[in-house]
A protein has these predicted regions:
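Intrinsically disordered, low-complexity, charge-dense segments enriched in Lys/Arg
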Residues: 125-155
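An amphipathic, hydrophobic-aromatic interaction surface with interspersed Lys/Arg
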Residues: 1-120, 147-155
Length: 155
């Protein structure tokens, strides 16, 4: 049975993953750090939405194009490399490869009603996120999160 996925729910889970990956206590961080974490969670949520939209745009291959598989295929297409090479990519490598697509993704207005970009900045989103937290680490994003939350999510 499909259960609709709230973008806010995904955002909160990503925020929790980031805190855990960096061994940070939600109540032990200052407001400046909190903004960086929220900004990064927003960016990773957009990344996850981009991958899901990519999967849906490839209907004939949709069953295997989810999570990291979709990211690998997108990196292969963008860089014209083999899947064997792309499978070695870390989350930071994938984000670096796809950052323009992520930044350019426009989320639906109903998504933005629930989640606002928590910190407006002239710095490109990826650079802003890396300023405080460093490079993206694999533990920040669980490629199967969407499916665990929804048991085959739908938008």
């Amino acid at each position: 049975m499909k259960k609709p996925l709230s973008h806010y729910e995904l955002f909160l889970c990503l925020e929790e993953s980031i805190l855990k990956a960096h061994s940070l206590d939600e109540y032990g961080i200052n407001s400046f750090q909190r903004q960086h974490i929220k900004h990064r969670a927003f960016f990773l949520m957009k990344f996850d939405v981009l991958l899901d939209l990519y999967r849906k745009s490839n209907n004939s291959k949709a069953d295997h194009l989810h999570g990291k598989n979709a990211a690998i295929v997108m990196c292969c297409e963008k860089l014209r490399i083999s899947p064997i090479e792309a499978k070695k990519f870390s989350l930071d490598d994938i984000i670096t490869t796809l950052h323009t697509d992520i930044n350019n993704l426009n989320l639906a207005s109903e998504v933005m009603d629930d989640i606002r970009n928590p910190y407006q900045s002239d710095i490109p989103e990826m650079e802003y996120s890396q300023h405080q937290l460093g490079s993206f680490i694999d533990a920040e994003w669980d490629p199967e999160l969407r499916y665990r939350l929804t048991s085959r999510a739908s938008y």
